[in-house]
Each structure stands twice: as C-alpha cells, then as structure tokens.
Amino acid sequence: MTPVLVDSNVLLDVATADPVWSAWSSAALERTADESILMINPLVYAEVSVGFPTIEALDEALPASLYRREDLPYEAAFLAGKCFVRYRRGGGSKASPLPDFYIGAHAAVAGYRLLTRDAARYRTYFPKLLIIAP
C-alpha cells in the first residue's frame, strides 16, 4: 500500500463540517483509508490544530491508529525552499515558504500520494506528484 499524505484542508473540511466540501472530503478519506496508509506531518498537524481547543481534542480527531505521524524529511525542507524561490521569482508575495510547499515536498520526496482538494499549487510545483483531488 502506497502511503497517502493527507492535506490539512481535507481534515478541516471534515472537522468543521464544511457545507461545500465535507461530503467529498469524508468520502475521500474513507476510500483512501481502505486502500492506503494515511499520513500526516507536523505542518498538517499545526494547520488542523487551529480548529481544536486542546491537544487532546486534536489527538482524538487524528488518532495515531488511523493517521501515521511522520516528521518532515530534511530533503523535503530543501525542496520546499527551492519551490519557494521559484514562487517568489514568479511574483509570489509571501515572505516565507508556504505550508503547502512543505506538504507537497514531503509527499514528493517520500514517494507518497497526496490527498487534497486544492491541487492547483501542488500540480504547479510538484508536477510528478500523484494527487487525489476532486
């Protein structure tokens, strides 16, 4: 089973019962969990944490038995930095690398697929990355 790194937007859709995306995100998570190992990293964890009052509540929503936690590889951090340079040279205005660069780079260097509902940036900066998206 090829692991799948889950983007925070999918998890937040489910956690917040997003009226537009929660049905798609819930179904995609369920389908992907049946056929793959679901992965999260510290950036995904941090982004999702804003919707929870305590770490215990977050850990209950993202149980380690369902979401394997993995640190960000240094190779992914390097690649994220290179993507950020490309972004800035292309006119991007952010002053530091975006979380999506770290998430996409992690999936890319680890050989994982990525489950997201916001595929455009990932496809731009990680064209070989296998993406599960609407």
Which residues fall in each region the model found?
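Active-site-proximal, substrate-binding regions of enzyme catalytic domains
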Residues: 53-75
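Active-site neighborhoods of divalent-metal-dependent phosphate/nucleic-acid chemistry enzymes
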Residues: 68-113, 117
